Amino acid sequence: MGLFIKKPFAALQAEANESGNKTLKRVLGPWSLIALGVGVIIGAGLFSITGTVAAGYTGPAITLSFAIAAIGCCFAGLCYAEFASMIPVAGSAYTYSYATMGELIAWIIGWDLVLEYTVAATTVSISWSRYLVVFLEGVGINIPHALAAYPWDGGIVNIPAALIVVLMSIFLIRGTEGSSIFNGFIVFLKVAVILIFVVLGWKYINAENYVPYIPANTGTLGEFGFSGVLRGAAIVFFAFLGFDAVSTAAQETKNPKRDMPVGILGSLLICTILYMVFAYVMTGVAHYSDFAGQQGIAPVAVAIDHMGHADATGVIHPDYPWLNRAIVLAILFGYCSVIMVTLLGQSRVFLSMSRDGLLPPFFSKIHEKYRTPAHSNLLFMVIVGGLAAFVPARVAGEMTSIGTLFAFTLVCAAVLIVRKSMPDVHRAFKTPFVPTVPILGILTCLCMMLFLPADTWIRLVLWMLIGLDVYACYGVKHSKLEHNVKRRKGLTILNMTGIALSVLSVITGLWHQQTVGWEEDKTLLAISFVFAFTHCAFYMVRIWKQTSEKKK
């Protein structure tokens, strides 16, 4: 089978049933998994993106946009739920791909997941730092800008962002059970703040603010009208990302075959309801046009300012001015759970790849006392902490989206494959309406990826090239499925993939430069060309050596 060898289902089942001091401790139940999902899905995006999208694209129909986005996300969620009940091991999409598409594809998706979780944790850590600065300024404490911003933003190092990564990593190293309890508390807190906003704001809803529910299109595609609702759905779609991290905790779940689908789909359902109700109240207490030009949590602040009574001059005096500070506090705590769950996800993917021999065994060692992959946790504490301290948030944020959507696409495709290749394997949960649901999931994710900026595609391609280098130099030789094979089949495909990615890096580089203008910053274009030429040479030399060895 060579590089497309598939991990036997029996081996996956044996891995799922492992027990003892050298395995992950099973402590999570269905509610813990739902809390993990809700914890990583709900971030500050709910408070900032809702008003912005309503003001620019949808009007009060933002609730429809959330519903459409949830349906699109549910396609991938249903596919994840089937695999999580069928193959309940750590590794998420990496493990599912290994069982259905083979080792090379599994490596690509595993490397992509590492990117997804790394940049997600980085992005949220940077945002956490910003909200901390705002919160402390409100109580008279000022952190010097140089110590709370990256170099490209006039600072030196973002210390708060790095510190929160270190703190959450220590939580994870000391045990999943304690981390789960902490996460549960945080989820309760931020859901409580959302519900308080909804309950307090309900009596201030003005029905006239919902008329028209879908404002007339301005004449530009995507600005109000039904096209605006669809554009809004594409934007708020990213507010649902993160539920896939639940599947990485399969080997720490007491009854994964039963509870994993509950955790994945339950968290999606709860978040959808919260998002829609929150958006309904927010656009009801204030007219959607009032949110225009607002950034951060300012749109919510506008709604809170309308939750009051007007005096004789018509000026509204808010009844709950403290709610703004409560929301900032909820965001700070809520971000902690997002960071923790993404750090958990990436360490579990690394653990699975290491156990399969594709990465050094150092990363699959389990801490004897805490029964957690401490080495992987420490590695990502250093990497994510460093990135959070020095990297711009926009770059990391867009990389999160494309990495997640790529993983969703392959998992949906894997369901189509596994239904044909493993029809008799027991599934505690089955994706309904196959092949319709997986196909719709693939199309939805690909459409979302196409709307992302060209520079995001460049970074994805460059990351994939680096990953292919690691696999070619280490993984191919140390894979446990074919560790005794001296010359593995499929090396030509591997080398051609490297050349194809090199060409793609040039294409995306030129695409980006054309988008921003040929006179603008050409740094990314230069990097893509350097990567392309060096990797083309590297993989062509590998092909030449392979051909020479065959002739001997």
Language model segments and positions:
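C-terminal membrane-solvent junction of multi-pass transporters and transport-like membrane proteins
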Residues: 153-156, 363-372, 408-459, 466-502
